[in-house]
Amino acid sequence: MQIKAQDTGQQKKSCLLSNIRNKWKNRNRGSFRQWVGKLSNGLMIPIAVLPIAGIFLGVGDAIAGNAGDLTGLRYFGLFIKNGGDVVFANLPILFAIAIAITFSQDAGVAGFSAFVFWAAMNGFMSSLILPFDKAGKIITDTSTPIAGFKVLYNKSVPVHAIATTLGLRTLSTSVFGGIIVGALTSVLYKKFYAIRLPDVIGFFSGTRFVPIICFVVAIPVALILLMIWPAVSIGLNAIGTGLGFLGGKGYGANSLIFGYIERSLIPFGVHHAFYAPLWYTSAGGSLQEIVNQQVWIRPDFHLSDNYVARVIGWVDPNNSSMYIIPGALNGQNGSSTGNTMSKDLNGALSAYMSKESTAFLTWKDLVDGLTFKGNFDKMAENGLLDGSNKIWLGLNGSGILGKKLLLSDGNVYTITFKTFANTTPIAWSKGAQAVLPLNASSTIVNNPTALAAATQSNNNTNNIKLYPVNSFRVAVESLNPAQYSQGKFPFMLFGIPAAGVAMILAAPKDRRKEAASIVGSAAFTSFLTGITEPFEFTFLFLAPWLFYGVHAVLAAVSFWLMNILGANVGQTFSGSFIDFILYGALPDGRRWLANSYLVPIIGLFLAAIYFPTFYFLIKHFNLATPGRGGKLITKKEYLASKAAAKAEGVSGVAENFTQTQIEAGILLQAYGGKENIVELGACITKLRVTVKNPELVKEEPIKELGAAGVMRTTPTFFVAVFGTRAAVYKSAMQDIIQGKVNWEALQKVINTDQLAVEPKETTPPKEVMPVVQDEIVILSPVNGTLKSLNQVPDETFKQKLVGEGVAIVPSDGHFKAPGEAGVKTELAFPGGHAYIFDIDGIKVMLHIGIDTVQINAKKQPGEPLEVFDIKTKQGEYTKEKSESVVEVDLKKLSKKYNPITPFVVMKESLENFKLVPIRQRGEIKVGQPIFKLVYKKSQA
């Protein structure tokens, strides 16, 4: 018995240790994926603004580049272009702010603190980054060519590792720096936003302390980055170069691999975090080298011959040798420093052979000679020299595309996207080919033989070195602009719609109309906007193998074919028809060789695979796609049932809540109640919810609200695909959790609605309109006497320029919110004299007294106010009826100002509602109905 007891004890001990080990192993299980998902969500905030910025960048450049002698038109184009430029130039800052806000529960002060952090960090770093020249001497002027930088103990940091931000020379941390700053800011915010400091410095307590601590922490972060980031930057550049060579010499293998991984990450919502480094950093390629003053067009003048312009030269067809010959471009002299090129070929060659000559020795000089001088410098300042997509946009707006070089055989070479793409075949036209002065002798320009003779003669006397053809390469052999994004166009514009047609035709004939209404809209969304999730999730949950084994593979093939066949079609957001026109068709219309014609060719090829493959697999495996399985409950059907319930008189008090609030409440119940919610998040199409107890989650109500699918990526992390409604639901659910909406009352409405009896057997309406409140009652905000607006000594209110309503002469200074619970303080003027409230979408203004804006006009932020003691905050919602808004010292106010208080419904709210007075004269008590708004359509 004793032995058994010991064995039992050992077993218990072993079991206990095993449990501890298992808990330790699983302590962070899934947390990293959740973090990456949240990061991906944050990245989408700045990415969302890139389409409009890209449009301005492209359109502005098109106007400026074709303005000719019309100075006004040119400046108008630059005006538009620069607006787009500045967004891309400050992309790292935007990422920092977005990440900080995302990880801090949408706290605005976190975004402000992130900007302080970013600015301070780069300011600290700039003082320790010192440029040096070829001799290794520190440069103190702006004209000496920069050979590199000294950063702390690192004595030779390459130029591409340094960038310009906020006008400061700093490390090229790009979006990685923004993510680092945003993440650190969110950590500091969560730790210090509620800090209480001693009373003597109490002003700096709470959220005011967050930007202060961010400023201080920026010091060690700056020093750490100065120590390690140059090596990281060099590593990223090497990755970009390596991936680029894999594309150029590996037959597009990089884009094939990228395409599959990018699609495969869609269900987890982390694909944004995957592609962002390749789109926006040097990991996706770099133009830094060819615009750096140290990269000479002539190889023996510099360390590397990897970045030689392949069109700047002459080929001897007899021995396959080539000479580098500089010359004037587009009628300009061939010197960036004012030296005039010789008018004859021999003079040009002689000038070039002198190492002291500056006549188009570098790519930067070449580009400056072809464009408005400094355009590539501007690209560098705006951060458009790194990242596959940013480079494409930079070139598109640089002014270099479309410029022409006069070749010695009489032909003209036009610089296009192909000049900078490693998929461009390395081939030279037969005969001589060189850049020459436009005023060179016509005998030489049009006579390759004479050119060869002159060159050979010059070679004999000046010892000109010959280079074999294969030593001269494309502009950047490791770069292909837009290679990590353009592959989306064929499968989004053609492949997915073809799969959609297959789904519709695979449904029984009597249900094809139903299938078309669901699948057709999702496929059209993919075509028009490039948002594919609504379609992809219709079959992802039914047959994951169809997604990963067919769709993701074909997407990868799309990327691969676009790359190896030589397309360079840009985009800012996704592979939509809109982006195709703006960044494919329009550049091709300007003959910039984006080769957008490949999109329909490859797209039709993929469609021919998508359609039969999806049709056969759906039929063969009897997949329950729309129209084939149980009837899908759409959002329209759900709203119709609610309308029927209301017709039976069941919905009762539903008018107190908006439709979005009701649906958000249903979602909260489906996720186990608001107490079960740990964290909420949303991207463009997906609602992300982390819960405490996953057993409480019910997926059916979520699907009934229109979710294309619900996926659990970790035991407690759920993703529901709602399309563009995801962010709306997230905000509404957040409001309920934070107490901005009466949860108990909302639950009663939801539970009552769900008790709705079966609708009568009558013909249902053809179209069910969203539930709109027929009447909204506005309550008096204060005790007092009602007056007409005509009696207000202010023409703005008297003439009803702001809106319609009444005036109140207050009898006390206790001002309340003019409605039941849920009134939002849309705007609270800093001086305390005026407020705008939002009552179920109706905007109501309360202006206490006349000219009272003067009372606190000279007060600085943080100083105590006179007369007004504000009890609400901008953006807050009331939790009960007639909640206190502001306490007013009415006696003090009345000494200098007229206390009559205009209370009006603003004009914007009167477009769909008619104001009906309930009380117009006499005494009124706070909380009593003062007027109501009647929905105009309900009167028809």
UniProtKB/Swiss-Prot annotation:
Gene Ontology biological process terms, A to Z: phosphoenolpyruvate-dependent sugar phosphotransferase system
Active site per database record: 683, 847
Molecular function GO labels: kinase activity; protein-N(PI)-phosphohistidine-sugar phosphotransferase activity; protein-phosphocysteine-sugar phosphotransferase activity
Catalytic activity: N(pros)-phospho-L-histidyl-[protein] + D-glucose(out) = D-glucose 6-phosphate(in) + L-histidyl-[protein]
Gene Ontology cellular-component annotations: plasma membrane
InterPro entries recorded: Dup_hybrid_motif, Glu_permease_IIB, PTrfase_EIIB_Cys, PTS_EIIA_1_perm, PTS_EIIC, PTS_EIIC_1, PTS_Glucose_EIICBA, PTS_IIB_1
Transmembrane segments: 43-63, 83-103, 112-132, 175-195, 209-229, 487-507, 515-535, 537-557, 564-584, 598-618
Ranges for domain PTS EIIB type-1: 661-743
Membrane topology, as annotated: Multi-pass membrane protein
Localization (cell): Cell membrane
Protein function: The phosphoenolpyruvate-dependent sugar phosphotransferase system (sugar PTS), a major carbohydrate active transport system, catalyzes the phosphorylation of incoming sugar substrates concomitantly with their translocation across the cell membrane. This system is involved in glucose transport.
NCBIfam families assigned to the protein according to its UniProt record, in alphabetical order: EIIB_glc, PTBA
Protein name: PTS system glucose-specific EIICBA component
Recorded name of the encoding gene: ptsG
